[in-house]
A protein has these predicted regions:
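A short amphipathic helical element positioned immediately N-terminal to and/or at the very start
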Residues: 5-14
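Transmembrane alpha-helical interface segments in multi-pass membrane proteins
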Residues: 18-29, 320-366, 392-408
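Membrane-proximal extracellular/periplasmic loop immediately following the first transmembrane helix
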Residues: 37-108, 115, 222-225, 372-382
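The feature marks short, hydrophobic/small-residue-biased sequence motifs that occur predominantly
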Residues: 101-103, 110-141, 147-148
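Mid-to-C-terminal secondary-structure elements
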Residues: 125-141, 152-282
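Conserved transmembrane alpha-helices of multi-pass membrane proteins
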Residues: 372-405
Length: 414
């Protein structure tokens, strides 16, 4: 029966090629637009390596500090290593807490007597590679002993390894980082710039440089950010409460100097962090969600309403056919079943076209569509299927269009 319905649906589409093409194109447009908008949002919050645990991340990229002599003024930016350790590294509830430089810095890397190339270097602690799941192709990350000793070692990407050594098998080899010798301990898959917290091309221990001394406000502010890996999303409330207590305790120590650290309700989860652009402003998550919902509704409703009208018109053209078939014994359920199948065929064909166009557009327009408003690197963002494709989103959009196509016929039409 279903096979027969399917054949009849295809035959009906061939009988009205213009209407069929317009219906498929309109539904494909709706799928294309909603998928493209969702992709733009998903790259900010959806998990992909090396940030596969985004649903368990809490971030403290920046904070503010005030002083009794500054009035209402504040100093805003990343924190110092000391502040990060005193407040966040000491937390007991999370699975892991990593401290790292808030942004990568373009630095020359080379081999002796060879021309240098630019690489984005991020300085981290050893826990960084426990929080972020890098895919190692050679070697391994530096461990706690190496980090504490300040040994000049580095983890590099495949592209940097090939540029320097001609292959990805470079663990144990040495190169010059800003004219200082470093030894490669591991090689990882290239990381997209869309992985904002973990992106880099070279990662080194911040104990191997003088970065911890790059501070201000009496060593309370500096160049460091923190990412917390919770054991479960359910622990977020407890982690935030513990962080508040540690902040309060630390501020009581700073009171003698006249300073007060301000977290602005940090740490933020991944979704909140994705819309946070300033250290001294707390993002409005409800407003951002409301704006996205309005955009989604508009993108879905405008094409769908037009398609619904077209389906209604097509059914009215078939009133005589429906009457004859009812007169010869066709039941209401059989007629409704055929209408549903016709709409399902249209939706599936249009969905495949819309999904294909959205993926092609995302790949071809990566530099424009996924360009970050604030970025410390000149490297263009890269995307792959693990970043772009989320079947649940496509299925929801497909179901929505199908429902709107189906709801156009009224019972009296059958």
């Amino acid at each position: 029966m279903i096979k027969q319905y399917f054949k009849q649906a295809l035959a009906q589409l061939r009988q009205h090629p213009l209407i069929s093409v317009i219906s498929i194109a309109g539904t494909a447009l709706s799928i294309f637009l909603i998928m493209l908008v969702v992709m733009l949002q998903q790259v900010k919050v959806a998990p992909f390596s090396p940030e596969s645990n985004r649903d368990r991340f809490l971030h403290v990229h920046y904070m503010s500090i005030s002083h009794k002599d500054w009035g209402d003024g504040t100093s805003n930016g990343p924190m110092s290593v000391r502040t990060a350790r005193e407040i966040y590294k000491s937390l007991k509830t999370p699975e892991a807490v990593t401290i790292y430089c808030s942004m990568p810095v373009s630095t020359p890397v080379s081999l002796p007597a060879m021309p240098a190339i630019g690489a984005d270097v991020r300085e981290t602690d050893d826990t960084f590679f426990k929080v972020f799941d890098f895919r190692f192709v050679n070697g391994k990350p530096y461990d706690e002993a190496t980090f504490n000793a300040g040994t000049p070692v580095a983890v590099i990407t495949e592209s940097i390894s090939r540029a320097l050594f001609g292959s990805t098998e470079s663990a144990g080899k040495e190169f010059l980082l800003n004219h200082a010798p470093y030894r490669v301990v591991g090689v990882v898959k290239d990381v997209s710039t869309l992985a904002d917290a973990s992106y880099g091309q070279v990662w080194i221990p911040f104990t191997s440089t003088d970065l911890p001394n790059d501070t201000w406000s009496d060593q309370h502010m500096g160049m460091m950010s923190v990412t917390i890996l919770a054991r479960s999303h359910d622990d977020f409330g407890e982690i935030r409460a513990e962080a508040k207590r540690r902040m309060s305790e630390y501020n009581s120590i700073l009171a003698d100097q006249g300073y007060t650290l301000i977290d602005r309700n940090r740490p933020y989860d991944q979704e909140t962090q994705s819309i946070s652009f300033a250290a001294n402003l707390e993002p409005d998550l409800k407003s951002a969600r409301r704006e996205r919902a309005i955009i989604f509704i508009i993108l879905l409703l405008v094409p769908a309403i037009n398609l619904s009208s077209m389906t209604q018109s097509r059914l009215r053209q078939r009133v005589a056919e429906i009457g004859v078939r009812r007169a010869f014994g066709s039941t209401r359920m059989e007629m409704v079943g055929q209408i549903i199948m016709e709409n399902l065929v249209v939706t599936l064909l249009a969905g495949a076209v819309g999904l294909f166009i959205s993926i092609v557009m995302a790949y071809l327009g990566t530099d424009i569509l996924f360009a970050q408003p604030y970025s410390a690197t000149l490297n263009a963002p890269t995307v792959d299927s693990s970043i772009l494709l989320h079947p649940s989103t496509f299925l929801y959009a497909l179901l929505f269009c199908f429902c709107l196509l189906y709801t156009s016929p009224s019972p009296r039409d059958c």
